[in-house]
Each structure stands twice: as structure tokens, then as C-alpha cells.
Amino acid sequence: MNTNSNTMVMNDANQAQITATFTKKILAHLDDPDSNKLAQFVQLFNPNNCRIIFNATPFAQATVFLQMWQNQVVQTQHALTGVDYHAIPGSGTLICNVNCKVRFDESGRDKMGQDATVPIQPNNTGNRNRPNDMNKPRPLWGPYFGISLQLIIDDRIFRNDFNGVISGFNYNMVYKPEDSLLKI
């Protein structure tokens, strides 16, 4: 029995698991309605050289994209369906092709549970109708959209270093269900 071969297979399986877990972490960040956690997500992106594309629209900086996602996209729920990754030899870089699906809250409310069409008044501190964790309305999930996500990430994720590892992020909706209320 060749122990080198076993180590290689074990290493590949471990890398595949780490890559899938990292991808799930990215999707969980996109689904998180808490805007205070935005800083944790920004740290994953390379601050000097990162390309972000969302449905053929480029973004110059990760913070601009993430603020748009937080403020203009309703609550989401992603489900990972497949991850395929390839290491580029000698570059320390991985190319990940991610297949997933996402559904959107079609209740007409934003991520904070407020009516998406009526802005909240900032001086209503005693408003009892304001949602909190206990009485926040539940999302009304629509049908799933198909998503294709391409990531360019550093292989430092295999050494448990996640700061600035994303240098490419290309998020595309490849399937839109006909019965969705959402217009994209």
C-alpha cells in the first residue's frame, strides 16, 4: 500500500471539503440580513486587486457591491448544489465554479422586516409596531432562481487564512422562474 497515494487522496478530499465550506460561508454572508456583519464579509475580499461582477455589472470595490446587496436586495436564501474547483499550478490560486440556487423574500419587506416601499421615520423610537426579533414578520419565499458563481480565491484558505482571499467574484442568475414576483 502506497502511503504517498493515500496522503494525496486524503489531502484532495480535505481541500474539497474546505473549498465547499468556504463557499457555504460566502453564501451565508450573502443571506445574512444583519448589516453590522458586513465588515466580516468585506475582509474576505482582496482590498487591492478584486474584480466583482453581478449580473454583468462590474463593481470597483467590494464595499460598494456589498452595500448595494445589503440595501437594494431583499432577504435571500441560498442553497449550494455543486462546487467544482481547480488549482492553477504555481500561482497559489483556485478557480471555483459554484452552482447554487437562491430564493427571495417576496413579502414586500426589506431585510430589516420593514415595508420596502414606505421608509421608516428615524425619530419613531417608541413605535410598538417596529419589528424586533420576536415579532419580526417571516419571509414569504418565492421560487428558486438558478445561480452560477465563479470565484478566484487564494489557496491560503487551506492554511486557515481567510483575509483578502477573494480576488474574483462573478455572480450570475442563469435561471429565472416564470412564477416569481421579483423582476430582475
Curated annotation (Swiss-Prot):
One of its GO terms (cellular component) is nuclear RNA export factor complex. Affects mRNA transport from the nucleus to the cytoplasm. Residues 120-129 have a biased composition (Polar residues). One of its GO terms (biological process) is tRNA export from nucleus. The gene is MTR2. Keywords: Nucleus, Phosphoprotein, Transport. Interacts with MEX67. Residues 111-135 are annotated as: Disordered. SUPFAM superfamilies: NTF2-like (SSF54427). It is found in: Nucleus. The modification Phosphothreonine is found at T125. It comes from the Eukaryota. InterPro entries: NTF2-like_dom_sf (IPR032710), Nucl_pore_RNA_shuttling_Mtr2 (IPR019488). This is mRNA transport regulator MTR2. Pfam families: Mtr2 (PF10429). Its main location: nucleus.
